[in-house]
Amino acid sequence: MNLHEYQAKQLFARYGLPAPAGYACTTPREAEEAASKIGSGPWVVKCQVHAGGRGKAGGVKVVNSKEEIRAFAEQWLGKRLVTYQTDAQGQPVRQILVEAATDIAKELYLGAVVDRGTRRVVFMASTEGGVEIEKVAEETPELIHKAIIDPLIGPMSYQGRELAFKLGLTGKQVSQFTKIFLGLANLFLERDLALVEINPLVITTQGDLICLDGKLGADGNALFRQAELREMHDPSQEDPREAQAAQWELNYVALDGNIGCMVNGAGLAMGTMDIVKLHGGAPANFLDVGGGATKERVTEAFKIILSDENVKAVLVNIFGGIVRCDLIADGIIGAVEEVGVHVPVVVRLEGNNAELGAKKLADSGLNIIAATSLTDAAKQAVAAVEAK
């Protein structure tokens, strides 16, 4: 679960991380009042969306008057911002962040993720701030410096100092960076985060370090014990279908194709998408109903898939292990009858009670295409789309 920049900076403040004075605003009037609270300009106004590339899309602007702030707020509040990280519809702008402008001498990068290889939280720092860290990692990996956090010990001051020296910091900047490093590490661990980025972490013309931007991603599996983070959830930034799927504990990701896929198991779901692509099709989604699929969840999965107007056929690929194929068949029949499916449905069942499930589908009298293998299922789904 991602947080907005203004929410990230609210948490930064609690952990002693310096950031520009700022306020999140929902109306043009609030934005003007925020400028008055901050003091004299210039100010920076930023659209709050869960996507990068805001600046290039016009969603970040340096302004010198309250009239410009009002104009920016009127331009963007209630509208949608399209960046290279969004789809063609963009993300809705419900708040803008008004904050004091900062005189920048140099831009740095500081971030942390969970490294699956070492099973540790890994901090990354670089002198190449203000650009995508993925690009730096690909083109100049030697410019990324790392610190691995031992889960039994936690973050140590010496790790912060080591990173500071590698970034070329001197004097008071070393102690400032170490404080930021320790605060960010404690924030990451105590709040069950999966990602944190300060990009850029800037050195001002006065020589001080300031967190100019903030990006936080919370571990969705830990939200049950992070009540405050749950309250920060902004469903407007999610695909409505993905949000609906989450309520039913379905793993759904919307894609750009036209063949809806319903599969049990993430690995099988990815394999199904691959083989659809191999035979000339384009998956409309990733959808894993999981090992505990019920008739109700299968019905809901169908509703979610068919709510995508681009879907021209549905491919159901079930390997019965924990889940019984006959229960899946009941769910498919119930969904087709309830929703009124008007696109071809191709079903491949294997494993636990597969024969019983296939018989139920055959006896239902519904227009369901039975597949003998995964390859056959993919070919039939692609053919069904091409025939429409």
Swiss-Prot record:
GO-annotated cellular components: cytosol; succinate-CoA ligase complex
Role description: Succinyl-CoA synthetase functions in the citric acid cycle (TCA), coupling the hydrolysis of succinyl-CoA to the synthesis of either ATP or GTP and thus represents the only step of substrate-level phosphorylation in the TCA. The beta subunit provides nucleotide specificity of the enzyme and binds the substrate succinate, while the binding sites for coenzyme A and phosphate are found in the alpha subunit.
Protein's UniProt name: Succinate--CoA ligase [ADP-forming] subunit beta
Quaternary structure and partners: Heterotetramer of two alpha and two beta subunits.
Lineage of the species this protein comes from: Bacteria, Pseudomonadati, Pseudomonadota, Gammaproteobacteria, Enterobacterales
Residues binding ATP, per UniProt: 46, 53-55, 99, 102, 107
PANTHER family listed in its UniProt record: SUCCINATE--COA LIGASE [GDP-FORMING] SUBUNIT BETA, MITOCHONDRIAL, SUCCINYL-COA SYNTHETASE BETA CHAIN
GO BP terms: succinyl-CoA metabolic process; tricarboxylic acid cycle
Name of encoding gene: sucC
GO molecular function annotations of the record: ATP binding; magnesium ion binding; succinate-CoA ligase (ADP-forming) activity; succinate-CoA ligase (GDP-forming) activity
